[in-house]
Amino acid sequence: MAPKGKVYRGSVKDFPGFNASQDADALCNAMKGFGSDKDAILDLITSRSNKQRLEICQAYKSQYGKDLIADLKYELTGKFERLIVSLMRPPAYSDAKEIKDAIAGIGTDEKCLIEILASRTNQEIHDLVAAYKDAYERDLEADVVGDTSGHFKKMLVVLLQGAREEDDVVSEDLVEQDAKDLLEAGELKWGTDEAQFIYILGRRSKQHLRMVFDEYLKISGKPIERSIRAELSGDFEKLKLAVVKCVRSTAEYFAERLYKAMKGLGTRDNTLIHIMVSRSEIDMLDIREVFRTKYDKSLHNMIKEDTSGEYKKALLKLCEGDDDAAAEFFPEAAQVAYRMWELSAVAKVELRGTVQPASNFNDDGDAQVLRKAMKGLGTDEGAIIEVLTQRSNAQRQQILKAYKAHYGRDLLADLKSELSGSLANLILGLMLTPAQYDAKQLRKAVEGDGTDESTLVEIMATRNNQEIAAINEAYQQAYHKSLEDDLSSDTSVHFKRLLVSLALGNRDEGPENLTQAHEDAKVVAETLKLADVPSNDSSDSLETRFLSILCTRSYPHLRRVFQEFVKMTNHDVEHAIRKRMSGDVRDAFVAIVRSVKNKPAFFADKLYKSMKGAGTDERTLTRIMISRSEIDLLNIRGEFIDLFDKSLYQMIEKDSGDYCKALLALCGGDD
């Protein structure tokens, strides 16, 4: 139940008028005869607290001389059986069973070890160790040590001690020192001093560590998660990231784990079951709130879409409510949103591409290699890919000139005649300057039947003033008309106003103005009808002012605006836009907000969506891989693996052929 002095945040509560003997009778009747009444079983068990379920087990034994868990195992099957049986165990014994399964047999389920040991309180760890000893007559630490290795093992052993300082222990004089020690142990040292990391992350109180992470961000300019990813790899990296996430917000950590358990093809049912069971009487309401905020979908609806039968019914009972139906935003979610904007506002991100200028570059030599690859019968696509994906755009422009000078031929025309399909689109795109390529993509988005609004927004919302100016010039030169005219003639009124404003390239590029940020946040709140005091402005006037703020304020300033917005309304701006706006304008506003928050994450999400499910959106995939290859594709790779538990390289690799080879070359490596 809830810790003393805190509001209960579980979804499962004690059943009023509880009678263990009557419940034991009801379960016995549900399992009598041919078949069993699964609905009766799930309705009863999911509506009782764990303490009440244990009393039912005792009453069942007393009345029928039989083991209730054994009978349930006999009557039920599959995922539903695993879920119901998990509910019948005390939490510590349920954790012990999960860990025993994780280390039994060949191989170890490291993710299960990480999830449990990174997220439990001191008391929960002590109870787990005792339950493991009682259930299996074995020492948990000895089994973990025997089944793991290296620094991963050392960190698990530290966590198994359950010796973290309690949350009211904050050594303010040590905060700055711990932050410096973490920085010196990682970023500033050749190799990482894991012992220092392990001690601080494994022993300091959560409240103390939150202050350490804030201090670390100030002195290093980057969140500690980014440093961990850069310095470490494998299970040790995953464990440390899990500890950091649980320190920041256990609810957010579990929301992310639940989302990853259900997204994409297939469901990780063991993960889904264990989290839904283990958090149902602790913080399920907080998890639901964070889930709704982060993924713009309620946990209830995701379970509903991803599962079936009695298994689904039981999970939904544990979830308890549908936050999409409530359409509310909650304090826990607001805290998470505020922290995300705070991180975005103060982090100093070093943008890094995957394609660098080739050393010992020889434009004439490359021109000769390309000519040889296209002469005679057949084409050597491999040679073309190897040269052009390993040169910077500036070097490719030199190759174009050298090819013309050496052979009197147009390299673009030759490539176009020799290549076809997706590979041709990719290689020809690489040969254009960034501005020419963006101009061409914008032209394709506005010509023909229908307008590709998503592409228009992606390009216009993510380019800086200098890039926008170059695109305008390239567009005029290539198509003999202004980009603004084409955008105006092919889009709706409000959407047109937004695109034209972005096309002017008049975004301020200075730092934030805190006074102005507060005033801008008021305008945003009034526009989205979340202000305490109604505005005298018309809705059209407010929308125009909101549009102006989004299109002309600097990114650092907008981050502060959206942070102020959370403080002012207890809502996240992206969530509010999705709820209160519609159509192309809503999608464009959301794209701008997500780009402001974290541009690499914005592109990582678009890349994932271009490849998930059946078929690949090659146009989007090609466009982003080309346009970001020399800017921030390395950052995008980092965000991709963090968001989707799979590297960008692995996601691309599922395809085959020369197009895939070229994409992998641009990707630049597997994370």
Curated annotation (Swiss-Prot):
Compartments, as annotated in UniProt: Cytoplasm; Melanosome
Annotated domain remarks: A pair of annexin repeats may form one binding site for calcium and phospholipid.
A single cellular component GO annotation: calcium channel complex
Gene3D superfamilies: Annexin (1.10.220.10)
GO aspect biological process, one term: calcium ion homeostasis
SUPFAM superfamilies: Annexin
Gene: ANXA6
Protein's name in the database: Annexin A6
Per-repeat ranges for Annexin: 18-89, 90-161, 173-245, 249-320, 361-432, 433-504, 519-594, 598-669
PANTHER family: ANNEXIN (PTHR10502), ANNEXIN A6 (PTHR10502:SF19)
Primary location: cytoplasm
Family note: Belongs to the annexin family.
InterPro entries: Annexin, Annexin_repeat, Annexin_repeat_CS, Annexin_sf, ANX6
Function in brief: May associate with CD21. May regulate the release of Ca(2+) from intracellular stores.
Keywords of this entry: Annexin, Calcium, Calcium/phospholipid-binding, Cytoplasm, Repeat
GO molecular function: calcium channel activity; calcium ion binding; calcium-dependent phospholipid binding; phosphatidylserine binding
